[in-house]
Amino acid sequence: MAENEAPDFLTMPSQNGEDTQPQVGMIAQYVKDFSFENPNAPAVYNWQNQPQIDVQFNIGTQQIADELHEAALRIEITAAAPEGVAFKLELLYGGLFALRNVPADALQPFLLGEAPRLLFPFARRVVADAVRDGGFPPLLLEPIDFTQLYMQQAEAQQVGAAGTAGSA
């Protein structure tokens, strides 16, 4: 050990036994809001044209308490054919996450990238079951890389902010 280096036990983050390592845990997951509309039943089951499926999603976050955050995944699906709307589905699927000792710069990447990734398989199942229960073949949503989407959005915001600052 070099003379300038402190022993490992002196550089530990806590001397009183308090755990200062980042900890993340999912406390609960739940359907916050759900709607399935089949406005043209029973005629829709005789339509000759396959509906076009439009899927939109959004992620929202909210701090509930000091170390408690909610991430919510909103999925909106419209299936439309030339004859009309086959079905419309709206799902708001949330998760409650305990985040302790997580650095401020890691909160948004977790809440907008990792948390939706954890919630998505369960929301996907709700969607597939609801569409099937509505009398249609189950709709299996393709996996979404939420972390990559978050990084792209953050990069676009930085470029936009730099462009705005450069033109001011």
Q: Which residue stretches match the model-derived regions?
A:
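N-terminal intrinsically disordered, cationic/polar leader segments
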Residues: A2-L118, F122-A168
